[in-house]
Structures are given as C-alpha cells and as structure tokens.
Amino acid sequence: MAVHNFDVVVIGSGPAGESAAINAAKHGKRVAIVEKQQAVGGNCTHWGTIPSKALRHQVKQIMQFNTNRMFRDIGEPRWFSFPRVLERSKVTIDQQVEMRTQFYSRNRINLFFGVARFRDEHTLTVRDNQDGVEELCAQQFVIATGSRPYRPADINFRHPRIYCSDTILGLSHTPRTLIIFGAGVIGSEYASIFSGLGVKVDLIDMRERLLSFLDDEISDALSYHLRQNGVLVRHNEDYESIEGDESGVIVKLKSGKRLRADAFLWANGRTGNTDELGLENIGLEPNGRGQLQVDEHYRTMVPHIYAVGDVIGWPSLASAAYDQGRSASDDFLDEDFRFVEDIPTGIYTIPEISSVGKNERELTEAKVPYEVAQAFFKDTARAQITGDTVGMLKILFHRETLEILGIHCFGDQASEILHIGQAIMQQKGEANTLKYFINTTFNYPTMAEAYRVAAQNGLNRVF
C-alpha cells in the first residue's frame, strides 16, 4: 500500500473543499484532495447548483420564446422535452469539470479519486473503484464532503417514477403531471422549472407559507407567480404514504387527500455525507442528519480536523461553503480569519429571489423604527426594454439614521442586483446609508438604477 505525506488533506472537491485546498496550496502547503466521484466538482457541479441552474436557464429561454410577441409573429410556440433541455445543461457541467481540474493542476494539488476513511487522527485511507488502497498522512484535515437528499425509509426510491433532487436529473421523459413534496428552496425551484415546461405541478408544503424565512411580501409574490404558472401549492400537509405503480404515483396525505401524478419528486431535507468517513476512529459523531458540529473557527472536536460546507448544516449554500473553506484554511495557516455570516440568499425560481439582512417581520418584532424603500421593475426603462417587468427591489432602512438594514429583490437578475446594495450595507458607520443611492450616478438604462428609484421612494416616507 502506497503511503503519501501532505501538510493538508481535503476530503471533497465541491466549493468548500476547492477553496480550502487552493488557499492552502497558495500558501506553500503540500495539499491533497480526495473526491469520491471520478470527476471533481462535488454535488454542486454534478447534481446540484450547476445543473439545476443551467436547466432553469434553458427553461427560461423557452418561456421567453413562447411568450414574446415578436417570436410569435414568426412561428408557433415550441415544446421541448425534459431530456432534450437537460442535454444542453450537461455542456455546462463538462466545462466546469475541465476548468476546476485545471485549477488543481495549476496549484500543484494532488488528486485522489476514491472513498476516504479515517484510520486515526492523522491518517486517511483512500479506496478507489478498483479496490486499490492508498494511505494519506497529514497535519491538517478538512472535511468538505457535502450532503445528499434525505431519503425516508418508507419511500421506495428504486421505483422508476419516484425521484429525489439528485436522480431527477436523470429523468428520461417529460411527465404531464408532477407531485413535489417539500416546498423549500429546491422544491420551489423545481416547481418553477417543470411548470415552465408545461407540466402540471402539485407542490406540497409542510408549513403555512412558502419559504417563511423570506420577507412576507417576497414570499407572497413567489406564491402568486407559481399559481400563475399552474402550480398548485398545498400548505400544512404531510404524507401518509407514497406508492408508485406502472402508470404513476399515488400520494396519500394525512389530511385525507389523495393525489396522483405521472412522477414524484422528494425535495424535503438533506443529509450530510459522513457515513463512510470512519468518524468513530477519531472520536467524532455526527448528528441525526449526518452533520458535524464545529466551533466558531470551523474546527471539530478534534482541533486539527475542520469541517465546512453542507456537512455542517446551515446555511447549505455553495456561496457560503466556498467562503467557509477559505476561512477554515486561513485559520490553520494563521492568516486573518473571518467567520462567514451576513450571507445573501439566492433562490433561482422563475422569477428569481435574492435577499440579505433583516426582513420586515424581524424588524417589527425587534421594535426597530424602519421604513420601506421600493422600486418596481415595471417602472424602469431597462425592464421595459427587455420585457422582464415582473419584480421589485425593496430596501429596509432605519428611518432616523438611514442605515440599510435589509435588501430584498424579486425578479429577473435579482441575485445580481442584490450585490450592489449588499456592498453598501456592509460599510461601517455612516458609509452605510440610503443616501449613497441618491448621490451616485448610475448608468442608464440599467436595472441598477432601481436603487436610486427605491431610495427616492423611501426618503419620501421620512418626515
């Protein structure tokens, strides 16, 4: 058995693992990265963020073609099958894998493909798909193994019509009807995608409202547009049983309702990928969802073993995972450490949603004297030109100091638009002010000028 010695070994090549490994390598450390799959990128690249967002982009283009009056003048609406749309999305995955493989090569990071398992606190074995075993020894370890869809034992995921958010990307036909259980971020995004392809979707929500962590006005806007696209949202529901047959799937709800569809997608919760790591050999125990507990420096109970990304739970975002990986490596490199917080949320429904900071409910409960600044996309020249007039920018600010407290955006390019306000919101002291948008000249016509419109709207409310 070959034995290799490194300064740092990172388990997992998703956003968290990639940033931890590259940061350590750029500081002169000998770094190895272990990836279970036969290509780098992790769940984010192969089954999660990248394919689903690429798929969403293709569906959005189809929707624009079918609703744009200019295109209707030259032809009838076009119908595309799910597999055909998905095929184009796979091009992006290949590009991502090639690019990230070059990152590791350029930074002289050693890649090992196989299942990683701790032998002791400083030793890791890697078993490849040919049952070959290699041993990696290191002073520091970073666990960045990500997560996978939570699969309840009473649901038969081997049935050809029952899917989770990973296997749905292997769907070989276009269902006429689809039941999605779980109305969180993933469930809402797929409800938008499939309804955009003309599929009738039942979205089952175990809570009272969609994405309750969002500002109420934004959540209500999402509910409205899902309904407009033919999505039936069922709140406060749970399943009694889910059974598939040759022609479809029958879902019995605890409320007594019975639903039937061509296919079923489970999108309710995720589990950390820790079951194959041999954590018992190093004295670590994950929680019931396979997640590891860490301190404010991303250290586990074993001080030289760090954990970052989805494997530690909230917020389970690729953007946060990337920053966590870099911050963890900064800690053992004795560089400036930053705990990752104030994380923006990007939800890629159609239209998309993005937010950062406090929402109205939180500010009201805290008795903060805030005011609302709004700009509607339909009132901006750029949106009128592109035709993407659905949406709004909402800024919450302190009515006395004009400090920006929260930013919420709904509509096309929301996740891009948000970062302008986020940059000002992160400034210290008086630099964080709504007046910045009044005193700044924006390009015209742009969506960015929505900040100026919103700021003027908000200041008109202050007396």
From Swiss-Prot:
GO terms for cellular component: cytosol. Its EC number is 1.6.1.1. Keywords: Cytoplasm, FAD, Flavoprotein, NAD, NADP, Oxidoreductase. FAD binds at E35, K36, Q37, Q38, A39, V40, G41, G42, N43, C44. Its cofactor is FAD. Belongs to the class-I pyridine nucleotide-disulfide oxidoreductase family. Conversion of NADPH, generated by peripheral catabolic pathways, to NADH, which can enter the respiratory chain for energy generation. This is Soluble pyridine nucleotide transhydrogenase. It comes from Chromohalobacter salexigens (strain ATCC BAA-138 / DSM 3043 / CIP 106854 / NCIMB 13768 / 1H11). The lineage of its organism: Bacteria, Pseudomonadati, Pseudomonadota, Gammaproteobacteria, Oceanospirillales. The gene is sthA.
